[in-house]
Amino acid sequence: MRFEPPKEEEIKTIFSQFKEVRFLNAGGFKAVYKVVANVGYEAFKIVHIPETSGIEPEVSNEIRKESLGRIAREIRILNDCKSPEIVKLGSIQPKQVILSNHEYVAYSEEFLDGNTLRELIKQSVKPSEEDLRSLFISLLKAIRELWSLNVIHRDIKPDNVMNLNRKDRRYVLLDLGIAFSISDTPLTFNGANRLPPGTYRYLAPEMLQPGFRESLDFRSDIYSAALTIYEYAAGQHPLAKNKDDLIATLSRIVRESPKSLGEYRADLSPFFIGTIDQMLKKIPALRPSNINLLIDKLEKNV
């Protein structure tokens, strides 16, 4: 069933305290609105709980449990994160609501005024190495913060990174809706028979292997961060092609080595190109794993 975001007027009927509601975007089963709430502008998020009518009660309960569990996990992680490189929760506490006979969970995050990397890529922006290093450092700090909580983001991609164009807080990582906690009970219902949650173009190769959850760690986020930086720098994804079907894309992720970033951006330093290339290795053990050392080298402009 296609997700239709609730109308702005519908939201105002439930949240009468909003002085202004403006739809921003939607993806998956989530919609985001810019609202004027208690403390000024906030990003109001409304997440649809899938309908399960016509499904066996036991399966229906598991699907609902997974959906609500992911929302609760995301909110808990955001509440625990202190890094400015990760989006913050807003003032509106989670609330289950019914709109047009559909069930949602609604809450807010801080409103971030900027552009996603996806928008900048579409504008054919060619970032400088200084800009790319700043992005690199921000993503590494976000990954480090999440891993300190035993969490893997699992969906780092250009759509989920915001450029605020501020010296004190240049890039921010968004959307922890499918974050994975190695210390929690797995949420995915019937996970052995489903592809892993995530955006397939940005999946690390190991996530396509049987039993991947048992050995998953922050190096999967390292891989996805490198893909994101590569695509922003080069203006194109190193493996996925726009006309590919899902199977072709997944096959490239597992089997094909990407071209060096240097083939598209020879103006970048050998250290920067080499580090991104190394982060895109198929085997996690071959990727750089000392985040603090990487940040130190990037900050010192090695």
Language-model regions, residue ranges each:
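Catalytic-loop of the protein kinase fold
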Residues: 147-164
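AlphaC helix of the protein kinase catalytic domain
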Residues: 116-127
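Conserved activation segment of eukaryotic-like protein kinases, specifically the C-terminal portion
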Residues: 191-207
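Conserved short submotifs of the Hanks-type protein kinase catalytic core
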Residues: 99-116
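Conserved HxN/HPN-centered segment at the entrance to the catalytic loop
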Residues: 82-93
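AlphaC helix of the eukaryotic protein kinase fold
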Residues: 58-80
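Activation segment signature within eukaryotic-like protein kinase domains
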Residues: 135-136
